[in-house]
């Protein structure tokens, strides 16, 4: 699943852990309350711990600190950091570009939908629970 601009904005708005009414969110995003509800269902599929309360709105179970791409780039000035909210696999992203990468180049994401662990087992990484990082480094033989 890709993270559309509307869904990214919803996550940003909800990251404070406070209640936000569907009407308020819809007004801020220029969409209907029904559309807000559909986007919330999609965000739950990413593993976000969202809940709703009649008369109060939607909220995350706990506040969430989202990464700041500019700050990450500043902390790693030697090599580019490719940042994503959602990606299939950080490792696969680098693997597909291996001939164009420089040493230390990395890929960072808040959620992977097709991550792989040891022996090809699925790597579960719901949104907002961790930062996933893969780094390219060429080792001389």
Features from the language model and the residues they span:
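N-terminal lobe of the biotin/lipoate ligase/transferase fold
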Residues: 2-141
């Amino acid at each position: 699943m890709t993270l559309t601009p509307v869904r990214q904005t919803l996550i940003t708005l909800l990251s404070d852990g406070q209640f936000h009414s569907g009407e308020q969110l819809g007004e801020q995003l220029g969409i209907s309350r029904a559309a807000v509800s559909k986007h919330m269902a999609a965000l739950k599929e990413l593993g976000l711990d969202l809940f709703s309360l009649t008369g109060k709105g939607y909220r995350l179970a706990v506040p969430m600190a989202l990464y700041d791409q500019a700050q990450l780039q500043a902390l790693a000035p030697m090599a580019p950091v490719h940042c994503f909210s959602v990606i299939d696999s950080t490792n696969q992203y680098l693997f597909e570009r291996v001939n164009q990468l420089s040493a230390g180049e990395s890929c960072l994401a808040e959620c992977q939908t097709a991550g792989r662990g040891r022996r090809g087992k699925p790597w579960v990484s719901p949104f907002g629970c961790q930062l996933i990082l893969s780094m390219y480094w060429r080792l001389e033989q």
